[in-house]
Amino acid sequence: MEEDNIVDSKEIENNVEDKKEETPSSSPSPSSSLQQQQEEGGVVKQAVSNLVSSSITLHDDAKLIQVTGKDEPFHFISVPMSVEFLNLEDVFIMQSDAYIFVWCSEQANIKKKAKAVQMAQKLKVEIGCQRAVQVLEIGEEHPTFLFCLGVPKGTKLNVTKEKNDIFQVDEDDEEQVLEPEFFLFKIFTGTDGKPSIKPMEEDEGINQEMLESSACFILDCEHEMYIWLGKGVKKSTKDTLIPVAKKIWTQYDRPEYYGKLKLQPIITWVFDGAESCLFKSKFSKWVEKAQPLQTSYLSLSSKKKEALNFDVSSMHQDKEVPVINIGAASDYSNGKLLVWCSGGGSGNKWNKVEEDDFGIFYSNKSYVCHFIYKPENKNSIRSVIFFWEGLYSNQRNYIGYKFGLYKEIQKKMEGLKSDDPVEYRISQNKEPQEFINLFGTELLVLNEELALKPMIFQVRANRGTQLFPDPDSCNAKLLNSLDSFVFLFPNKYIIVWHGKVSTEHQRELAADLFTFLPPEYEAGVKEFDQGKESDNFWKIIGGNSNDIVINTFINENKEEKEKEEEEKEEEEEEEEEEEEEEEEEKDNNKTTTIIKHLRPKKIKLFLCTDNSGIFKADQINPFSQVDLNSQECVLLDVYHKVFLWKGSKSTDQKLNDTQDLAKQYIETANDQRPSDCSVELVEQYNESPLFKSYFHSWKVTPPKVFIDPIISYKQKLAERLQKEKEDLEKLKQQQEQEQEQQQKENNKIVEEVKEEVKEEDVKEEVKEEEVKEEEVKEEEVKEVAKEETKEEIKEEVNDEATEVKEVNQVEEEVKEEEVKEEVKVEVKEEEVKGEAKEEEVKEEEVKEEEVKEEVKEVKEEVKEEVKQDKEEEVNEEIKEETKEEETKEDDNKEDEKVNEENETVNEENEVGIIVSPPSEKVDEANSSSTISSPENEGSVSVKDKRKSNEPITPSVVSSSGDLLFAYEPYHGPPIHSSNSPKQGRKGGRKSHGKNQPQHKKNHSVDQSPLSSPIIPNKSLNLDIDNQSFDLNSINNNNSVEVLDGASSPLSFSSSSINSNSTHNTPSKKNKNKNKKKHNRSSSLTHA
């Protein structure tokens, strides 16, 4: 239930702040998914399920009741709304505000079926359902019944469960089923102020006498619970009932499906004197409380005598309408109006209405209008509540309001130091003027939610009401001479029709009625008066002028009119014309008859009853269709005629007495009514259109007639067969149409394919020519490239001074040109690939590979020539160095001393020689560069170092034969680096652009990870055998530099250098083995 807090006392004069509090109810969803119920809540809904919206209608609080048990008394248990709970043994009742179904199979017991129908009839009266109870069998389910159960549209209901399985099984004997037992607990407040529980036990079970009006009781039915509130229960006790009920629910065993579906307990409120029929069925015997005697102590004979003594003349006196004195200002500007509308069938949910929607009501809902005001010349705060009920609203809304929203309003008014609000309960079409003044001057009543479809409104007095006519009878028969009618066609036109005796206020309201609706309903307005309709009007509305209900009376007065002659001096011409007309009238002695339609002076309704022991007629003012009691007779006086309406359950004696009373009423009338005034008999369900026209927005209620089920079954079967035939014919027609359409489409597709094939052939020929031209151009470009590379290489080899630099530059230029060629080839390949076929692409790839192999061969020839030249130069340089070393023996001795001192320092550091593996094609240019020391970042060749008598730092063996050593600090076992050799090569390739400076750094240091195994190169072994160098000089010069420069990546030690030494790193297989052993050991430890 949504409850709206009202106001603070400081803001009454200006605005009222509303605060909403939510109190969820415990109710499972009716769909097959069985949503979880809400747990918390101070007020629990009486129904088991939430709102179910259907394309057919709205079903509020739909719930499923299972009628089960072997023998009488049968059990009525509320179960979740799902197909899973249906079985062939029991009978099920589906209850909603719109429908009540009784579903059963052929296996169900006859007594059980009868009890289920009897309970369904009681539920229908209790909830105010308008439709009759429908008994369904397997295979004949109503679409709404299937929808509420969650059965998909178009599928049939399939129930295979034969027996009931919601009852618990006896632990000792599993074949024996335990039927549910009922336990009654008395809840009262103890001396300590805390709630106390007292079980009510009797050998014969629970009975009605256990319930006391001064206490509260909780009835535990194993599958559901009821809270019974006595009339004299204190407020403090009520607040503790829900927690106590939940505690009792958790202490005892419940059916298994509650645990599987995680459902919350079904708790229902029951009030003393207003017990539901399901609650009464839990008791072995329930006796209705005796109603007060409504008959007098007089005998029937005395009734007749006193009936004759009834003063009929009192019926001619007008009954005053009771005036509601609100006490506020006449303009209602100093107050605050709050409006709520019912949001559910049980009346526990109330939704706030926005101010823009004030004055618009729905006939299927109830409204609570709370007006807070300050009386004139007073400082106190007062309030009044109008409870408005629509014609199609649920009567239980008022009960839910009294025990829910009214309590909240009462609390807020107490906080404002105000008395309880004065309450008025009014029904549709019987609104007092004070109620209408709260919303202005007019009201609008709708029967259904707004939709862009034609609507008809009847305007009478200051109310506009949407009609709910039969679709087949929507024509001029709805019109009458007393009222105005509005035919609204959204986005097209609005037709307003006025009766002959409709008032000016009605005409204004009818013309402006569309202003109450959203802007999309606006259209051009065309007004018509009765008797002045056009042909287009009858085409749109239907019918003709003879179908209009003439509910006026005609006053015919024959008078001889003699006009006196009057001479006018100022206007001679007018005087002559008037004299001629007067002379003609005198000569002919003409008599004129004036016929005029008049509105009935007063329309009165009298209810004729003998409840007080005296047969009399009580006037009802204002009156509506609701006042027509089927057990009584009613007199309707329309001045020129008196209707006698007989209820379907009224007796013949009441009819005779009412007829006598009607005759006396006409005879004693002194209001100059027509002399031919008579009494017309009207029976319930057979009312004439003239009788209905005097009631505002007549509600169509079909009579309750017994229908033979066999006849109805035959009619349904015939209708079903007829529908099947029609469906088959429609299917055949559709199939024929589809086949024709498919043939047309196929012909179109064939023509389109032919055109596409022709276009593709032309495109392929063009593509082939373009491909051939591109191939010729590529061959020419490749030949030119080959010649240029050969010439450039020969020129670079001849230069002796800059051999190494020029070779590098040539290789870089060759690479750049290759890259450019590759880019061009790739661009052309992409264009050719997108256009040419797969076979042509393969041929181009083969040709590209041949070109690359030729370029590789040229490179290898150039490299071999360069290697041979360098080897000769190195041999000559080595010879010269041996001579220089002999002259410098003295210097070497000093160096040896320094080495001995450094050996002690370098014992802890070990140097690993990393010999790079045979470099790939991409690394050939990088391997030829030498490593620069940390101090000297410029590019210095090996030859220059030897000439300058500086120690040489070998890193690795390049392709030219130089030794290039990479020294890395030794930190224990080798560890795999995160960078792979391929990544280093890609980075080194990018660093040598054409326009970038050539810094000769040793890329092999970064490229070769320490953890990778060292593979000795054949060229390295040959060069080491042919060369000789002093390791001590290397250690003496470089070890100090490494110690000084902490940031240098090179470190040295006195350990011997072994070119063939390798680091054994764990292989992938060993890693996998280790991981598997770890997993097993871990699993064992866990086990």
Curated annotation (Swiss-Prot):
Knockout-associated phenotype: Severe defect in the ability of slugs to orient properly towards the light.
Record keywords, A-Z: Coiled coil, Cytoplasmic vesicle, Repeat
Similarity annotation: Belongs to the villin/gelsolin family.
Coiled-coil boundaries: 550-598, 710-912
Compositional bias segments (type: Low complexity): 24-40, 1047-1065
PANTHER family with a match to the protein in the record: GELSOLIN-RELATED PROTEIN OF 125 KDA (PTHR11977:SF129), VILLIN (PTHR11977)
Source organism of this protein record: Dictyostelium discoideum (Social amoeba)
Segments of skewed composition (Basic residues): 983-1002, 1066-1080
UniProt keyword annotation of Ribonucleoprotein present: no
Polar residues composition-biased segments: 925-939, 950-961, 1018-1040
Gene assigned in the entry: gnrA
Biased composition (Acidic residues): 562-586, 901-910
Protein name: Gelsolin-related protein of 125 kDa
Any one GO CC term of the record: cytoplasmic vesicle
Biased composition (Basic and acidic residues): 7-23, 732-770, 779-808, 817-840, 849-900
Protein's GO biological process: actin filament severing; actin polymerization or depolymerization; barbed-end actin filament capping; phototaxis; slug development involved in sorocarp development
The keyword Coiled coil is annotated on this UniProt entry: yes
